[in-house]
Amino acid sequence: MASTLSPSITPQTEEPPVVPVRIQNAADISVIVIYFIVVLAVGLWSMVRSNRGTVGGFFLAGHDMAWWPMGASLFASNIGSNHFVGLAGTGAASGIAIAAVEWNALLMVLVLGWVFLPIYIKAGVLTMPEYLRKRFGGKRLQIYLSVLSLFIMVALQTSSIIFSGAIFIQLALGLNLYLAVFILLAITAFYTVAGGLASVIYTDSVQTFIMLLGSLILMGFAFAEVGGYESFTEKYMNAIPSVVEGDNLTISPKCYTPQPDSFHVFRDPVTGDIPWPGLIFGMTILAIWYWCADQVIVQRCLCGKNMSHVKAACILCGYLKLLPMFLMVMPGMISRILYTDKVACVVPSECEKQCGTAVGCTNYAYPTLVLELMPDGLRGLMLSVMLASLMSSLTSIFNSASTLFTIDLYTKIRKKASERELMIAGRIFGMVLIAVSILWVPLVQVSQNGQLFHYIGSVSSYLGPPLGAVFMLAIFFKRVNEQGAFWGLMVGLVVGLIRLIAEFVYGTGSCVAPSNCPKIICGVHYMYFAIILFFVSIIVILGVSFLTEPIPDVHLYRLCWSLWNNTEERIDLDAEELETQEEAGGALEEDSEQSRGCLKRACCLLCGLQNTGPKLTKEEEAALRQKFSDTSEKPLWRTVMNINAVLLLGVAVFVHAYFA
């Protein structure tokens, strides 16, 4: 029989409930302290051993990263605290279908490694807007994508991560929200701003191990508590809250009864909350943007030792993406079984009493399971898991945002900036972004509408498809030009913003209180909207491109798939501007080590700004660029990677078929 969690709050209070502090024993606190010591130690170690004194060293880890930390960082950058809270919450509300969104990444991470990355590496770029500049020429595409990417990082990615992490921290420690967020961001900022991408990737590797270990232990406790898998499937379908009436509302049984297709990933195309055509096609379109053209993800792969290491990292990440179903979604469903009245509450006043949120408490499924089920010590380990997922994602976002700002925006403002100036600008912007993220927390608090993961998916569906369309056509269709790409992005942005603004104005509603948004705007499921927006963008891009002049092949060598293996010299569309910047940068002299004061030398040592050796000659720079743009592989390792990719695809087909 499903048990319920008795609220420990006085019903008469008008304020949000004050949850008793759960982590206040020596065992839990010791585990958390050890976690922070280990993470900071790894961050300091990677700062000392890595080259942080150049743009390539700071932003791309010197192009010398092995496959296993790179693959772990790919996974950790994607799996944040918003996944633990969001996936578990949606699982508690509607079943396992949301896990198929994670499995969708298995295919796209292989497309990234085998199709998109060879082009990016051949192009010799640091950022995705930089690739668009090389591919199409001009500045407006690069600047637009940089600004939009920074907005998405702050408004969507960072906000959802901080919100979900704050839920857990408040429940566990009873800290003030802003104090908890400030402490986390301060520690995160230290090794992100000082250490660069190498520091981020190595700490991500440690945090991936902690995430997997802690969530595996919790999964074991959860299934043991519920009586095994068969008992789990039976009890979930009976997990109905005891309070289903109140507040003068007539609540439909479908709002509090588990869905009949809760244990199927493919659901009705019309009435399903995650319709199968939207899951297969809509989420694949979003995955093209996120996994193949998003700065946070692609930057991790651009730092690999060689192409084989890059592909191996993608394969490792693909296998790890099989786990969220079992480590997050199913534990969230078990939380509904064990604590039904809290997690599955449906009456607004009851939800306010249970978790302080009228729209529902499914986002509290995973934190509640951790705090109620885990013993002392292991509870501290699970808080460390949440901190690990939160901090690993934030470090990835902060480092990538610094890269975007420095390479794509700051160089437009300061065309004669030296390498040292670019390094300082990147670090300062990282701190600015952290400050903006803290200021964004109040907006995050008022945007906790419904299920967090659906919020992330819907906003992504309104902004991401045009970007995916541009990158896909840029690589596969050389006839596309700058005018087509720009106007395709503009039309896609306008259409997406109409839907996004309408949902902010009218609200997305809930099962109990549906939204009043006009059906013609909000009546289409966000996954279907992503498909429509994607093809609208493609039509505009191709239409405008065919009506305007094509780009000569001499500017496209090794920038699109049909000209990938061309060995002729490419003439960049912005070659003259780049030469001017290089001459200006080379003319600036750096101050010598001896001329600096003690304080300045200490700051330079912390931030990796110490001199790293004599300036390279033009011949040495050309040889280095040739090395970094090399995509060749040894035949043996190419075969091994291809076999593993086929095996991973087979596993993906099997899990989809088994849970269909």
From Swiss-Prot:
Q: Which Pfam families match?
A: SSF (PF00474)
- Extracellular side, ranges: 49-54, 104-105, 164-166, 230-277, 335-380, 445-455, 506-526
Specify the superkingdom: Eukaryota
Write out the catalysed reaction: D-glucose(out) + 2 Na(+)(out) = D-glucose(in) + 2 Na(+)(in)
One GO term (biological process): D-glucose transmembrane transport
Q: Let me know which tissues express this protein, per UniProt.
A: Expressed in small intestine. Expressed in kidney.
Q: Which InterPro entries match?
A: Na/Glc_symporter_sf, Na/solute_symporter, Na/solute_symporter_CS
The subcellular localization recorded is: Cell membrane
Provide GO CC annotations from the record: membrane; plasma membrane
Membrane topology category: Multi-pass membrane protein
Q: Which UniProt keywords apply?
A: Cell membrane, Membrane, Transmembrane, Transmembrane helix
Annotated membrane-spanning segments are 28-48, 55-75, 83-103, 106-126, 143-163, 167-187, 209-229, 278-298, 314-334, 381-401, 424-444, 456-476, 485-505, 527-547, 640-660
Induction cue: Significantly increased by cadnium.
Q: Name one GO molecular function term.
A: carbohydrate:monoatomic cation symporter activity
Activity regulation:
Inhibited by phlorizin.
- Functional description taken from the UniProt entry: Low-affinity sodium/D-glucose symporter. Generates D-glucose-induced depolarization in a pH-independent manner.
Q: State the similarity comment.
A: Belongs to the sodium:solute symporter (SSF) (TC 2.A.21) family.
Per its record, how is this protein called by name? Solute carrier family 5 member 4B
Annotated source species: Mus musculus
